[in-house]
């Protein structure tokens, strides 16, 4: 802890570090080379892990897009942030993050940071819920849940709508690849603000459907089974842009002054628009829209060369709400809102033997819920997954598993471990 204390003490007197939060969309539990995907090229993420700390028991705040983002930006469980389902994807639609919630951007802005949202928003498509009303000085990207990466239209059930904005102005970049536009926008923002600390929320619309990897990546994976070939091409395309973004930080001479963190918002999709799959959840059961491990256990990394450990792995139980208090502690800035559920990860980052900062974690999502305490996990009203055994009537109500003994969540112990069930259920109150 002495090393971390020196870093934090120095930070309080020196210029505050820049922070870039990279948030990918529908990236599966092990969909990176550094997480064991041997059929996938991700040199950008692999290098980030080599220059930082990689987490193996990191949980998204939800198994669906908007609530996961709400948890990230507020440090609160989505149910306490007031958003447990997706926000609308058409202008003026219902749902979104309440403007009264204090966001990560507002916290950084109050500490003198320049703040930018670049990429996907999906936290409200009304003026009072869009990024510039939530603490971001600058915003570039789409407000809805996804777009075509070349036309920048939201294609769903109609009407199809164009969705690309710079601040409150609709812009048109027809035919230009959205991940490239994101890197260009981030580079311009960093260049403009390189003399002061900045915070960038870099929220990628990948590998969320539509699967639109570059030609070179489609060629690279053409012999893989469908739809893994399409999915991998898009993951490698996003990784290529992450690598480019980090090289731009290096080029500007800012790497040792910049904390870069990465997380997927939840597990991979098996929706029809996603070709019914393509992602890899490894040994875990489940996927997006489920609270099995494959829906919420996600890849996550933090890197700050010269300040945090390099090429190390942490196995403690952590959560997407933890980024806000962690960044605040590392940057020595005060939290505006202290009534949050996230806990600082700094002790875990520094010490592989430090305990998890959480006694337990909880999830609430459209009727489903889950509690994890230690190795025990209780799911309430679990949704069937395409990769697990069929759920019996009792399983559909309560499903208890010991993750240390059954990482695939295949055997329900709720009927025999009633004392554990009662203990975990009580934590929801």
Identify what each model region corresponds to.
Residues 11-399, 405-427:
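Formylglycine-dependent sulfatase
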């Amino acid at each position: 802890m002495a090393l971390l204390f020196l870093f934090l003490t120095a930070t309080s007197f020196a210029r505050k570090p820049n922070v870039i939060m990279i948030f990918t969309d529908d990236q599966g539990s092990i969909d990176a080379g550094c997480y064991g995907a041997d059929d996938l090229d991700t040199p950008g993420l692999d290098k980030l892990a080599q220059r930082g700390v990689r987490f193996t028991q990191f949980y998204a705040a939800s198994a669906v897009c908007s609530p996961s983002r709400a948890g990230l930006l507020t440090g609160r469980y989505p149910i306490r942030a007031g958003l447990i389902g997706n926000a609308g994807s058409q202008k003026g639609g219902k749902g979104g993050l309440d403007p009264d919630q204090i966001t990560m951007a507002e916290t950084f802005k109050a500490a003198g940071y320049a703040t930018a949202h670049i990429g996907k928003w999906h936290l409200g498509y009304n003026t009072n819920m869009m990024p510039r009303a939530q603490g971001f000085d600058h915003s570039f990207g789409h407000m809805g849940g996804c777009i075509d990466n070349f036309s920048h239209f939201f294609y769903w059930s109609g009407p199809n709508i164009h969705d690309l904005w710079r601040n409150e102005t609709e812009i048109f970049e027809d035919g230009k690849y959205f991940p490239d536009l994101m890197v260009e926008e981030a580079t311009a923002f960093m260049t403009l603000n390189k003399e002061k600390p900045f915070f960038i929320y870099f929220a990628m619309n990948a590998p969320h459907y539509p699967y639109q990897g570059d030609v070179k990546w489609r060629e690279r994976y053409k012999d893989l089974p469908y739809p893994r070939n399409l999915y991998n091409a898009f993951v490698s395309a996003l990784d290529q842009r992450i690598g480019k973004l980090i090289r731009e930080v290096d080029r500007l001479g800012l790497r040792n002054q910049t904390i870069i963190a990465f997380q997927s918002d939840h597990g991979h999709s098996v929706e029809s628009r996603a070709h019914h799959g393509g992602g890899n959840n490894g040994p875990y059961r489940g996927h997006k829209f489920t609270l099995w491990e494959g829906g919420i256990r996600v890849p996550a990394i933090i890197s700050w060369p010269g300040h945090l450990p390099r090429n190390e792995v942490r196995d403690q139980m952590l959560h997407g709400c933890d980024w806000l208090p962690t960044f605040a502690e590392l940057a020595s800035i005060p939290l505006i809102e202290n009534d949050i559920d996230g806990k600082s990860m700094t002790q875990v980052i520094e010490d592989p033997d430090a305990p998890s900062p959480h006694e337990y974690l909880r999830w609430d999502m459209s009727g489903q819920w889950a509690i994890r305490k230690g190795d025990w996990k209780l799911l309430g009203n679990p949704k069937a997954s395409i990769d697990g055994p069929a759920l019996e009537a009792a399983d559909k109500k309560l499903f208890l598993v010991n993750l240390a003994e059954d990482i695939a969540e295949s055997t329900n112990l709720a009927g025999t471990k009633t004392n554990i069930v009662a203990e975990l259920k009580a934590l929801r109150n």
